[in-house]
Structure formats: C-alpha cells, structure tokens
Amino acid sequence: MSISRRTLLTASVSGLSLLGLAACTRTTPTPATPTATPSTMPTPTPTPGATGLPEPTAFARSDWAGDPFARGSGSFLRPGATTADREALARPIQDRVFFAGEATSADRPGTVAGAYASGLRAAGEVDRAGAGSERVAVVGAGIAGTAAARALRDAGHDVVLVEARADLGGRIRAAGGTGWPHPAELGALWIAADDDDLLRDAIEAAGITRYGLALVAEDRGPDGAVLGPSSAGSDAVAAARAWALAQPGAVSLAAALRETGGDALPTEGGAASPAARLAAILATDVAIAHGAAPDELSGARGLDEPAPVGNVAVTGGFAGLVQHLLRDQDIDVLRESTVSRIAYGNGRVGLRLGSGESLSVDRVVVTVPLGVLQEGAIAFDPALPSSHDVAIRALGPGRADRIWLRFAEPFWSTTATVWTSYDEDGRFTRWYNLMPISGEPVLMAEVGAEAAERVAAMDDEALRAAALRSLAPFADTELLATPEPTTTGEPRATPTP
C-alpha cells in the first residue's frame, strides 16, 4: 500500500468501513437526554454475527453533520486560516451583536471548555456594553448559550434563551436508558484533567461524576498481531508541518505531505510499514481530532489547535451541566424556535423567528454552530462586516461522530483502553475500551472527516456489521467459544475459528 496522492486526500475515510417552544416559560428547564438511535435487546445472550463476534446488546450513534441545527461537530482551520480568524468572529458588532461558541475560542476550539469560556466571555462583553439591566436574547441553548444566559442573569439582565430544538443542550446529547451503565455521550464526553478550572468547577458544582481514564494505546494489524511502536507517521506529519510553516502561501496538510515525501514512504511490512503508520495517523489522530481530511486542513496551523480528547470522561451525563446552569433562574426559554433574521442597525435588535413572530431586545448573543452560520440559516441586517464574513469562511465545519456498542460479555482480553484497528479491508478505526469506567463491556469508536460521512450514509444494520469487522483484530478466540454437544449430551466449548 503506497501513500499516493489519493490516499493522502482520502485517508480519513479509513475509519470503520463507515467509520452533537412556541410559548415562553418561566420554569426551570430540564434538558432531556434523547436516545439517538439506541437499541437494546431483550436478553443478554450474545448472538454471533457474521464476523464470529457477538452482536451488541445496545447500540447508539451520532450524525452531527446531518443535524440541521449543528451542521458539524466542531470547527477547524482551513489552509490560510489562523486563530486570528476565531478572534475576528468573536468580536462584537456595534455593541449589539455578540458571538460565542467553540468556533470563537482561540485557545480551546472544539471543546466544552472552550465553548463554556466563550459564553462567559460574551456575557461579560454584553454587561460592559450596557448601562444597567437590559433585555438580552441568547440564540442557542448549548453549553456556550446556557453559560452566557446564566452569567447575564446573575448580572441582573432580563434574559430570553432561544433554542431551535425541543431539548436543551445543543451538541450535548446522549443515549440513555437501561441499555447503558452510564449515558452514552454522542457529543461532548472528554475534559482535560489539567487546567480546565472554570469548567471543572462548574461540573463539580453540578455534581456530575467523572472518571480519569488511563489512555493506554494498542495498535493491531488484520491478523490480530500487536504492532510495535513507530514514529514514522508522526515524523512524516511533523516534517510536513515544518515545511508548510516556511511557505509564504496557504498550503494544506496533504500538499505538505506530498512535498516532503509522505506519498513515498515504504510499504514493506503491511500494517507495520511507515506508509501504513502515516495513513493510520491521518485517519485517526488528524481526522477525529479536527474533523477534517488532509486536503481540508491547514498544513501550517491546523495541527496547532489542541485535540478535544482529554483523559477524563464525564460519566454522570453532561446534560446535568445545562440543568445546573439554568436551575432556579428566572430565564425565559423559547424551545423549538428557530431564528431566521437578526436586525441590529437601529439601536435595538430585532429577531425574526421561524414561526413569523418577532422579538425585540437590547442586545443578542449568537451561539449557533459554525456550520449553521456558513449555511446562511440566519440572515443579518445589515449584513455582517467583511471581517466576520471572512472569518466564517476561513474556518471549516468539523465532521466527527461516535458509535457506541455494549456487549453481554467481553470478547477481548487486552486491558489497553485506546485501540487502533487495521482491519482486513485496510481501514483504520479508533476504539476506546470503556470497561475500566463502568465495569461493563462497552466500546466506543470515533470517526472523522470523510469516514464520518460514510458512517452517516449507513443504516444501523450496516453500521453494526462494519463496526464488528473493524473489531475483529482485537477479538480473543478463547473468549469466542461456542457450545458444541458431546456424545453424552453435555455442551463442550469449542473455539470459533
């Protein structure tokens, strides 16, 4: 397998073969925890699938790019973009229109920590721009919007929170129910253990449980053999980034890899070859962390931004943080209310809702995801300044999704928690073994970029089958024993071939 130009452009496909109220209320809003395509089987008896692996007893998946109120899982830097574009998007317009959300975070984009901090930042800007208590609208009830709404209410403002969905939380969403030992988070899941002080304090105040997962990596080839450590892939990416930084113009990561020999790495050794190691990094670390394919991502700056994967998993349900922020707050909440137009040129701000109703406020905080802004779902009058428009176009909407599987019994014996599977089809998949968190056989895969698009095109049955194929290298044949009758009528365990 050579890392050709086509491979560089499509490496992120490699994950799985596949592979976040019409009326006004003054009550404490309680975000639901929707079950996004979960399925639970009536008995825990494992049923062998086509791969010889047992069928999962519970299943859940996300599709953030297909969500009309998300249009992506996060944001990334296209070629030529820098963090200055995020800062430009975050700037207030005429002290009337303010922006928040992960895409406006210069230091932690794509994370709950970045979104939460951006909501607090925008609330502070609104408070400083006004004179006393004002009527403020917050568009979007994700973590940025709810953080802004709570901070504004604490500062004495009259706040109305406008959310397009029936449920609050935005890209905080989970599959729950009896099929899962803890909520299967389809959007936000990880937080860092180090310096997320603001977010950590809020999570602790909300009483949400967390688990520090030891990230122990293990890579396996199609035959199940453990692959030894190699720096070939990371060295190739580092060389490409260094070359891109030295160029006067904008170049993609794919172009930088071609210029530095990434398309000519040796293929001898199959899954252990330098070429395969580079393809694995592009399909997992790059595609999942940034939601972008190599030809979409800035070669110079795209990898500067920290990955949204930390080493602490939220196990008590991230939706509880939204509940906590809005609990006992005198905040108007408009559910199932899309905003189609924001007019801000006459000293006030007018919001036109999809229902045809209008809302007049002093200022507005817009927290809708980048993909929604790019789609033009909200018309601004007057049009956004060119600096904001350029920033919106310079950033890319990330595409990353999750698939969760629960089994009746584990079919693996490795204690590693971060798996990279190189299956017989030559595809790479990143899996997390979450048994240390819950004590239950739960696995979670993450896919990004074009792999996420392929996942979205699969129905549940095809996706489960693809997931099991990608897990085959980690199966322990001794744990896949099937009962076979003996001459005495007693069952005898025979390993499944």
Language model segments and positions:
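FAD-dinucleotide binding site
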Residues: 2-497
